[in-house]
Amino acid sequence: MKKLCTALLLSLFAISFAHANETKQIVLKVKEMNCQLCAYLVNKELRNINGVISTKASIKDGLVTVVEDPNVTNQQLFDAIHKLKYTAEVVN
């Protein structure tokens, strides 16, 4: 049983590590994002994109960190933010 649990944990770790290597992170500056509702809407719109894994918006900095698979394009992110009548630019 102990060997089975160890093997299972190692497998999960290997899968997680492999998945981490298949993602990229991008930081966007969204100038119009200045309240909690704005941040919520930006997060929601970006998470609707197929391939976006997670987002984290900071209204203090006006930045959104997006973790995505490599197939997601910057234009897809810009288009999603533009639906809210906001503008975005890549910071990193």
From Swiss-Prot:
Keywords: Metal-binding. Gene3D superfamilies: 3.30.70.100. GO terms for molecular function: metal ion binding. A metal cation binds at residues 35, 38. InterPro entries: HMA_dom, HMA_dom_sf. It comes from the Bacteria. Pfam families: HMA. Signal peptide: none annotated. PROSITE patterns: HMA_2. Residues 24-89 form the HMA domain. This is Uncharacterized protein HI_1050. The lineage of its organism: Bacteria, Pseudomonadati, Pseudomonadota, Gammaproteobacteria, Pasteurellales.
